[in-house]
Amino acid sequence: MKRVSQMTALAMALGLACASSWAAELAKPLTLDQLQQQNGKAIDTRPSAFYNGWPQTLNGPSGHELAALNLSASWLDKMSTEQLNAWIKQHNLKTDAPVALYGNDKDVDAVKTRLQKAGLTHISILSDALSEPSRLQKLPHFEQLVYPQWLHDLQQGKEVTAKPAGDWKVIEAAWGAPKLYLISHIPGADYIDTNEVESEPLWNKVSDEQLKAMLAKHGIRHDTTVILYGRDVYAAARVAQIMLYAGVKDVRLLDGGWQTWSDAGLPVERGTPPKVKAEPDFGVKIPAQPQLMLDMEQARGLLHRQDASLVSIRSWPEFIGTTSGYSYIKPKGEIAGARWGHAGSDSTHMEDFHNPDGTMRSADDITAMWKAWNIKPEQQVSFYCGTGWRASETFMYARAMGWKNVSVYDGGWYEWSSDPKNPVATGERGPDSSK
């Protein structure tokens, strides 16, 4: 009898384990209303471009479900178990709380499998996902962050969403000679050396006359759509932000830069930059948008205000003064009264703003990160870093998010620290330090 009872108990235990597994596999689909009633969370498994607002088909729905998180299946091979667990913790997902996935079957299955391995037990399908366009959320200006297939389709002459209104150009931006460009670049792309838009001693933007000459050289008018990309996104963003300051109306970034194009397996070419017909008539006075670039006194005027934020886009070690972040910048510290807007692990990384594939993190994540330091969309906000690259990338993201009164303090820490009379802060501190 004892042997029988042991076998029975084992069978029951195995049955319960299987039932638990099947429950996870076959959780009943939920509508968005049902999910919200259970205080659950929706997870969008599509690439971030579609989450942000790009329709997957020409006339398809645009955006993501209300309060949905984005965990793209395409990121999973770039996320370790520890990174996924950190993502789950950051978004406050409980192992026994319901989550509902949506996307194509393959992506949903891949994300479900990883979440199950991470310990989530109540995973279902969002049965009415993307069925009501009126309730979908999206970046106000998602079109300013293009994705590889969209750009390829544009180059092929296909109909695309948010098509440029007139002439358009694709340009790679990087510092120095086009070494990597020569080996492989997006077909038809021009090349801009960042030395054409900024110069020593402080690496501030060049004069307006020099900007005019640079734009003419590359055949750019104020009404030319310019699509920029870089091996480093912030190099392209630096050029993009300066072009907007000059007056180019429609400037876009390839979200994630060159790496996303390469990962997509799209065509490339090699060789020198193409010959470009000069365009001497920019069409408007430069700068057409001077408010996008602040000088030191204008930046100083934003400090210690509740209706404004001067925002440091530097790593935490830079912010607290343990490193300057640059071999050529000796002073350490931060502008006293500046608010920390996050950046990355050091002066050459921007992980705090990137998904695992290098694309922009969700607007909800970025907004929450900034809100903790009293950086809000209704304020006048100016970003700075060491010399302008990281600040420019952040500016482009804020612009896509619909923040209306944003700019870059061009001189940044390099300029500020060069004047010993300017107040400097060091050491560990929190948001209250900027009041």
Curated annotation (Swiss-Prot):
The reply to whether Transferase figures as a keyword in the UniProt entry is yes
Give the EC number(s) listed in the UniProt record.
2.8.1.1
Q: Where does substrate bind?
A: 390
Whether Repeat counts among this entry's keywords is yes
PANTHER family, per the entry: SULFURTRANSFERASE, THIOSULFATE SULFERTANSFERASE
Q: Which organism is it from?
A: Escherichia coli (strain K12)
Q: Where is the signal peptide?
A: 1-23
Q: List the disulfide bonds.
A: none
Q: Mind telling me what this protein is named?
A: Thiosulfate sulfurtransferase YnjE
Where does this protein chiefly localize?
periplasm
What SUPFAM superfamilies does this protein map onto? Rhodanese/Cell cycle control phosphatase (SSF52821)
GO CC: one term? Answer: periplasmic space
Q: Which InterPro entries match?
A: Rhodanese-like_dom, Rhodanese-like_dom_sf, Thiosulphate_STrfase_CS, TST/MPST-like
Query: Source organism's superkingdom?
Result: Bacteria
Q: Where is the Rhodanese domain?
A: 36-138, 164-270, 304-425
Effect of mutating residue 385 to A: Loss of activity
| Miscellaneous information on this protein | In vitro, YnjE can be efficiently persulfurated by the cysteine desulfurase IscS.
Query: Which keywords belong to this entry?
Result: Periplasm, Repeat, Signal, Transferase
Q: Indicate where this protein resides in the cell.
A: Periplasm
